[in-house]
Structures are given as structure tokens and as C-alpha cells.
Amino acid sequence: MVLSGKDLTAYRNEDVLFQGLSFCLFPQQLMTITGPNGIGKSTLLRIIAGLFKAAEGHVSLKDQEQIYPVATACHYLGPQNAMKPFLSVIDNLQFWSAFYGQPLHSPHEVLADIGLSDLEHVPFNVLSTGQKRRIAIARLLLSYRPVWILDEPISGIDSYAQTLLTNIFQYHLNQGGMIIAATHSPLGIPENHKITLEKFLPPQEKIQ
């Protein structure tokens, strides 16, 4: 299975965010996307995930036999955590488990994986920033999807939790998964590809 983007271009209003951007990602590979805030990292992730349409170019996920829709083969983690604030942690994860179908792990199991089993009955909105992010990442473990598309996945995470998440990311890669992450901080595992978005600005903006 290969995930690729070819000559991607995106706009914000009338301004070009990036252009001519291509990549190719294979199983067990990590690709990071870097650049200052506002340059288009989140837009690129949403294009790859099938949430936005590129102004030019295309994204495909395929193997030797068929082409797959990226949206149904990926877990997308945006800057927001996609949890209902007044539901308990366990109720949120049970909702997502039912939504995904084909459960790989139970909500209780994924809470143990991220070291937060003792918070299962706590309302999501009273958690710390780092705890909320860990719960959001636990959601990815409920059902297997080969492609993880992550927007600042370790933002607000302390060093202990970063070690836990590094192990989770590495395990996903070892199982044949792929990860694309926009991040200001290293994920703690070797990256196979790195996209520096400044390199894909229009020529006049590169000069500035």
C-alpha cells in the first residue's frame, strides 16, 4: 500500500499556501510536516485526509490491486480533540468505538495504553490539556486504520506522556501503519520523510 500526493496546490482566499508539493509514503514510514504557524500545515493534512480538496493535484492510496479512499483508511487527529466536553472519558471513547465499528481494542484497554485508566469516569472538560490530548490519541487505538494523520499530536504533553505516545506511534509503524504528522516537536522516532512547507511557497514569497 502506497500513499502519495502529486503536485498539490492549496489557496487561502486568493493567496497560494503551497504549490507543486509531492510525496510518497510506504508502510512503516513516518513523514513530518514543518513550518511556522499559518503556513498551511493543517490545510495540507486535511487535503491528505480527504477533508479538503486541493486546488491542483491529487492524493491517492493504493496497492497493486485497487485504490482506496483515504478518508476511510485513515485516523485524522486535528488541533481540537473531537470529544464531547461534558461526557466522561469512557463515554466519549465508547461513542467513538461504536462510530468506527470493527473494534480492535476496548475503551478500557486504550485508556490503559495511555496510562489514564483512573480517569475513565471524569468529565472530559475537567482534564488538563495534556490529558485531553492523550485521550484523543487513545481514540486512534480503538479501530485499526493504516494511515494516521496527526496535527500537533504531542502539543501540551509532558515528557512522561511523550514516552508513552512515542511507543504507541512506533508500534503502529511496526504493524505496517503510516504516520503523517505536522509538528513543532520531534515525535521521538526516526522520520523517513520531511516536508518543509517554506520550500513550496510561490517564488516571490520565497524571496521575501
Swiss-Prot record:
Residues 3-206 form the ABC transporter domain. Keywords: ATP-binding, Cell inner membrane, Cell membrane, Cytochrome c-type biogenesis, Membrane, Nucleotide-binding, Translocase, Transport. One of its GO terms (molecular function) is ABC-type heme transporter activity. Its main location: membrane. It catalyses: heme b(in) + ATP + H2O = heme b(out) + ADP + phosphate + H(+). GO terms for cellular component: plasma membrane. Its EC number is 7.6.2.5. ATP binds at residues 35-42. Pfam families: ABC_tran. InterPro entries: AAA+_ATPase (IPR003593), ABC_transporter-like_ATP-bd (IPR003439), ABC_transptr_haem_export_CcmA (IPR005895), P-loop_NTPase (IPR027417). SUPFAM superfamilies: P-loop containing nucleoside triphosphate hydrolases. It is a peripheral membrane protein. Part of the ABC transporter complex CcmAB involved in the biogenesis of c-type cytochromes; once thought to export heme, this seems not to be the case, but its exact role is uncertain. Responsible for energy coupling to the transport system. This is Cytochrome c biogenesis ATP-binding export protein CcmA. The lineage of its organism: Bacteria, Pseudomonadati, Pseudomonadota, Alphaproteobacteria, Hyphomicrobiales.
